[in-house]
């Protein structure tokens, strides 16, 4: 008799995705981040659900309800900080996952890559709206500044912003709708993850060499289930270190002050994982130009597959592209640092140079390096 996991209509989907899935024999730890992102999403949905049981999305009580969660709810402080720092872990894994895709040429799986970009936007939107919910100073002013960017859209901008706000400023209506969207989006993300995996399993995983591995596959279980389990353990360890020893390390102290529309904080800045995009936005003196650069800083990922000029898929055997890739990583770290600095000399100039370098590497230098490497192959 055939095993039930191979015959049962539901179980066989799980079987083909997580157990009997043929996987390349040489995928490295960089391939762990997909499953780690799944773990992060589950942690966020679970902790978020328990937070939503005690949270109230009203401007008068939102801040107090978060205080109540931390002080009065059993292990409420733990749930709250797991959720807040879980978001940071989520973005660390996301950026590693995208970086892996760029380095090893995984973007040639177009459908998988494009769904991934949609997922990235959805997670960023969810994180932004979640940051507004505690209704602290940075929540309020962050929401005001970022939603205001849409007013740069010609003709319909101002109307659009007021429509999103549900009034003439960020107020009760805004908070309530942000809570509703923040609750529903993770489930939409979970559905998109299924589609992401569906497209991935049409082709099978890429591998570090970038060479088809059809002749050398191994079953996902037990080899990669145990490898993923190790990744889970390391992620949870890191998250717990953060939550239990310095839960406010990545947060902003301004968010412990209740929102006050009459008092603007000296430095309005988003959470650390948006700082690179914020730096690109600020480095352009024109409002619409800045907004376009902000959107393009992420949307540029959609152009990457069409800029692939190399005869090889992966960067494993392409030293010039490797150097450019790591300069790009350093550039993103520089932008992240600049995004958290005040708008004054020399930070303005550093930000502008780093922004130009970011777009130049992706749009010009990497394709050129690929063409040079193609020539070197013939020597």
From Swiss-Prot:
<comment type="function">
    <text>Component of the ubiquinol-cytochrome c reductase complex (complex III or cytochrome b-c1 complex) that is part of the mitochondrial respiratory chain. The b-c1 complex mediates electron transfer from ubiquinol to cytochrome c. Contributes to the generation of a proton gradient across the mitochondrial membrane that is then used for ATP synthesis.</text>
</comment>
<feature type="transmembrane region" description="Helical">
    <location>
        <begin position="320"/>
        <end position="340"/>
    </location>
</feature>
<feature type="binding site" description="axial binding residue">
    <location>
        <position position="97"/>
    </location>
    <ligand>
        <name>heme b b566</name>
    </ligand>
</feature>
<feature type="transmembrane region" description="Helical">
    <location>
        <begin position="347"/>
        <end position="367"/>
    </location>
</feature>
<feature type="binding site" description="axial binding residue">
    <location>
        <position position="196"/>
    </location>
    <ligand>
        <name>heme b b566</name>
    </ligand>
</feature>
<keyword id="KW-0408">Iron</keyword>
<keyword id="KW-0830">Ubiquinone</keyword>
<comment type="subunit">
    <text>The cytochrome bc1 complex contains 11 subunits: 3 respiratory subunits (MT-CYB, CYC1 and UQCRFS1), 2 core proteins (UQCRC1 and UQCRC2) and 6 low-molecular weight proteins (UQCRH/QCR6, UQCRB/QCR7, UQCRQ/QCR8, UQCR10/QCR9, UQCR11/QCR10 and a cleavage product of UQCRFS1). This cytochrome bc1 complex then forms a dimer.</text>
</comment>
<dbReference type="InterPro" id="IPR016174">
    <property type="entry name" value="Di-haem_cyt_TM"/>
</dbReference>
<dbReference type="InterPro" id="IPR005798">
    <property type="entry name" value="Cyt_b/b6_C"/>
</dbReference>
<dbReference type="Pfam" id="PF00032">
    <property type="entry name" value="Cytochrom_B_C"/>
</dbReference>
<feature type="binding site" description="axial binding residue">
    <location>
        <position position="83"/>
    </location>
    <ligand>
        <name>heme b b562</name>
    </ligand>
</feature>
<feature type="transmembrane region" description="Helical">
    <location>
        <begin position="288"/>
        <end position="308"/>
    </location>
</feature>
<keyword id="KW-0812">Transmembrane</keyword>
<dbReference type="GO" id="GO:0008121">
    <property type="term" value="F:ubiquinol-cytochrome-c reductase activity"/>
</dbReference>
<dbReference type="GO" id="GO:0006122">
    <property type="term" value="P:mitochondrial electron transport, ubiquinol to cytochrome c"/>
</dbReference>
<dbReference type="InterPro" id="IPR030689">
    <property type="entry name" value="Cytochrome_b"/>
</dbReference>
<feature type="binding site" description="axial binding residue">
    <location>
        <position position="182"/>
    </location>
    <ligand>
        <name>heme b b562</name>
    </ligand>
</feature>
<dbReference type="InterPro" id="IPR027387">
    <property type="entry name" value="Cytb/b6-like_sf"/>
</dbReference>
<dbReference type="Pfam" id="PF00033">
    <property type="entry name" value="Cytochrome_B"/>
</dbReference>
<feature type="transmembrane region" description="Helical">
    <location>
        <begin position="226"/>
        <end position="246"/>
    </location>
</feature>
<feature type="transmembrane region" description="Helical">
    <location>
        <begin position="77"/>
        <end position="98"/>
    </location>
</feature>
<keyword id="KW-1133">Transmembrane helix</keyword>
<dbReference type="InterPro" id="IPR036150">
    <property type="entry name" value="Cyt_b/b6_C_sf"/>
</dbReference>
<keyword id="KW-0679">Respiratory chain</keyword>
<keyword id="KW-0496">Mitochondrion</keyword>
<comment type="similarity">
    <text>Belongs to the cytochrome b family.</text>
</comment>
<keyword id="KW-0813">Transport</keyword>
<keyword id="KW-0349">Heme</keyword>
<feature type="transmembrane region" description="Helical">
    <location>
        <begin position="178"/>
        <end position="198"/>
    </location>
</feature>
<dbReference type="InterPro" id="IPR048259">
    <property type="entry name" value="Cytochrome_b_N_euk/bac"/>
</dbReference>
<dbReference type="GO" id="GO:0045275">
    <property type="term" value="C:respiratory chain complex III"/>
</dbReference>
<keyword id="KW-0999">Mitochondrion inner membrane</keyword>
<keyword id="KW-0479">Metal-binding</keyword>
<dbReference type="GO" id="GO:0005743">
    <property type="term" value="C:mitochondrial inner membrane"/>
</dbReference>
<dbReference type="InterPro" id="IPR005797">
    <property type="entry name" value="Cyt_b/b6_N"/>
</dbReference>
<keyword id="KW-0249">Electron transport</keyword>
<protein>
    <recommendedName>
        <fullName>Cytochrome b</fullName>
    </recommendedName>
</protein>
<feature type="transmembrane region" description="Helical">
    <location>
        <begin position="33"/>
        <end position="53"/>
    </location>
</feature>
<feature type="binding site">
    <location>
        <position position="201"/>
    </location>
    <ligand>
        <name>a ubiquinone</name>
    </ligand>
</feature>
<dbReference type="GO" id="GO:0046872">
    <property type="term" value="F:metal ion binding"/>
</dbReference>
<feature type="transmembrane region" description="Helical">
    <location>
        <begin position="113"/>
        <end position="133"/>
    </location>
</feature>
């Amino acid at each position: 008799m055939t095993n039930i996991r191979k015959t049962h209509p539901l179980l066989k989907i799980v079987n083909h995705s997580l157990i009997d899935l043929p996987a390349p024999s040489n995928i490295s730890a960089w391939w762990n981040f997909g499953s780690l992102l799944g773990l992060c999403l589950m942690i966020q949905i679970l902790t978020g659900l328990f937070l939503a049981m005690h949270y109230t999305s009203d401007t008068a009580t939102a801040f107090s309800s978060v205080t109540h969660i931390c002080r009065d709810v059993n292990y409420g402080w733990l749930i709250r900080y797991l959720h807040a720092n879980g978001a940071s872990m989520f973005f660390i894994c996301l950026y590693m996952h995208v970086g892996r895709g760029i380095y090893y040429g995984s973007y040639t799986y177009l459908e998988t890559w494009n769904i991934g970009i949609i997922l990235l936007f959805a997670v960023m939107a969810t994180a932004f709206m979640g940051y507004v919910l505690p209704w602290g100073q940075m929540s309020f002013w962050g929401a005001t500044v970022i939603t205001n960017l849409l007013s740069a859209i010609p003709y319909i901008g101002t109307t659009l912003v007021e429509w999103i706000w549900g009034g003439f400023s960020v107020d009760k209506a805004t908070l309530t709708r942000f809570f509703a969207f923040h609750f529903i989006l993770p489930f939409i993300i979970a559905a998109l993850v299924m589609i992401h995996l569906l497209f991935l399993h049409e082709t099978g995983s890429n591998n570090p060499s970038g060479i088809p591995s059809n002749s050398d596959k191994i079953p996902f279980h037990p080899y990669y289930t145990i490898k993923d389990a190790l990744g889970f353990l390391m992620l949870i360890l890191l998250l717990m270190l953060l939550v239990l020893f310095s839960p406010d390390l990545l947060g902003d102290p301004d968010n412990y002050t209740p929102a006050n529309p009459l008092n603007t904080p000296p430095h309005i800045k988003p959470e650390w994982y948006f700082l690179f995009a914020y730096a690109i936005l600020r480095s352009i003196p024109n409002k619409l130009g800045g907004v376009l650069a902000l959107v393009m800083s992420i949307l540029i990922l959609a152009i990457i597959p069409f800029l692939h000029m190399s005869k090889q898929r992966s960067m494993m055997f392409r030293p010039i592209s490797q150097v450019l890739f790591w300069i790009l990583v350093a550039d993103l770290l520089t932008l992240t640092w600049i995004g958290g600095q005040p708008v004054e000399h020399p930070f303005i100039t550093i930000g502008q140079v780093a922004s130009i370098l970011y777009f130049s590497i992706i749009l010009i230098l990497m394709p050129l390096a690929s063409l040079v490497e193609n020539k070197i192959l013939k020597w």
